[in-house]
Amino acid sequence: MSVEDGGMPGLSRPRQARWTLMLLLSTAMYGAHAPLLALCHVDGRVPFRPSSAVLLTELTKLLLCAFSLLVGWQAWPQGAPPWRQAAPFALSALLYGANNNLVIYLQRYMDPSTYQVLSNLKIGSTAVLYCLCLRHRLSVRQGLALLLLMAAGACYAAGGLQVPGNTLPRPPPAAAASPMPLHITPLGLLLLILYCLISGLSSVYTELLMKRQQLPLALQNLFLYTFGVLLNLGLHAGGGPGPGLLEGFSGWAALVVLSQALNGLLMSVVMKHGSSITRLFVVSCSLVVNAVLSAVLLRLQLTAAFFLATLLIGLAMRLYYGSR
C-alpha cells in the first residue's frame, strides 16, 4: 500500500480505516508529548536527564520490535537474516541522533519562541529533499499546501496559547521558559539551517531505505533501533555526571517514554507505506492536539492565532490531498 499523493486507492475500506486510525493515534501522541513533559516538571524543571528519556524510548522501541519478530517468526522467509542490509540504518540512527541533540544545543543561541517559529523551515527542507531524493514531483497546489503548513506552524508557535489573564501570547509548553527577549545569533541561524536540513534528510533517507529494501518492517526497525540504542547509550554515558538512568522518573515520565516509543513504531509504518510528506501533516495536525491538551491540563488559553493555524492546516490538507 502506498500513500504518495493522499488517499489509499486500491485499499479495502477496513484497511483504509486502520490506516486512518493509525494516523489519528500518531497525531494524538505527537500532540500529547509537550503537555505530558510539562506535567513531569518538579519545581519548574524536568527532574530527569533528557538523554535518559531518549535512551529509554529507543530501548522500548527495540524491545517491542524484538517481541514482534518473535511473535511473527513463522511467517518469515527461510534463510539467515540479511545482516549486511543493517549497515545503512547506522546512518539513519546517526542523523536522528544529531537532530535530537541539535534541538537542545540550539537553545543556547536563540530564545525558545524564535526556535519554535523558525524550526518550521524543516517542512520546506523535507519537501525539497523529498523531491530530489525520491524523484517525486509536487504540483503547484501541493507546494502551496506545504507553504500553508509552514505558515500554520509559525503562527501557532508565535502565539497560539497564553496564560489566563495575560494579554501576551505564550509559546507552546515545550518552549515555555523564563521570560527571554527575542534573539538569534549568526551561529544560531547557521545551526538552525543545519537542523532543518538534517531533519529533512533523516526523514527522506529513512523512507528511501525502508522502501528499497525488501525486508519486513519489524526487521528494519530492529536494525534502526539497535543502532539508536547504541548511539544514545554512548551519548548518555559521555554526558558526564548527573542523575541516574531512572532517577527522577514518575508515572508521567513513563507515559512519555511509552507514547514516544509507540509513536516511533507508527511513524515507521508511515515511512514504509506512506511518505515523509504524510509525516509532516501528522506533525502539523498534532499542534491542534497539543493546544487542546495544554488548555485542559495546563490551564492555558487558546488565542486567535491557534484558530488561524487550525484553519491553515485544514486548508493545506484540502489542497494537498483534495481532488485535483
From Swiss-Prot:
Q: Name one GO molecular function term.
A: pyrimidine nucleotide-sugar transmembrane transporter activity
InterPro entries referenced in this protein's UniProt entry, alphabetically: Nuc_sug_transpt
Cytoplasmic side, ranges: 1-18, 74-85, 164-180, 236-250, 299-324
- Outline which residue ranges sit on the Lumenal face: 40-52, 107-142, 202-214, 272-275
Compartment(s): Golgi apparatus membrane
Q: Might you report a single GO cellular component term?
A: Golgi membrane
- Asked if the record carries the keyword Cell cycle, the reply is no
Q: Which domain of life is it from?
A: Eukaryota
Q: Note the topology in the membrane.
A: Multi-pass membrane protein
Q: Does the keyword Transmembrane helix apply?
A: yes
Q: Mind listing the UniProt keywords for this protein, alphabetically?
A: Golgi apparatus, Membrane, Sugar transport, Transmembrane, Transmembrane helix, Transport
As given in the record, the signal peptide range reads: none
Q: Which reaction does it catalyse?
A: CDP-L-ribitol(in) + CDP(out) = CDP-L-ribitol(out) + CDP(in)
Q: Which residues cross the membrane?
A: 19-39, 53-73, 86-106, 143-163, 181-201, 215-235, 251-271, 276-298
The record's similarity note reads: Belongs to the nucleotide-sugar transporter family. SLC35A subfamily.
Role noted for this protein: Mediates the transport of CDP-ribitol. Does not exhibit CMP-sialic acid, UDP-galactose and UDP-N-acetylglucosamine transport activity.
Describe the protein's quaternary organization and the partners it interacts with: Found in a complex with SLC35A2 and SLC35A3.
Q: What is this protein called?
A: Probable UDP-sugar transporter protein SLC35A4
Species of provenance: Pongo abelii (Sumatran orangutan)
Q: What is the lineage of its organism?
A: Eukaryota, Metazoa, Chordata, Craniata, Vertebrata
Name of encoding gene: SLC35A4
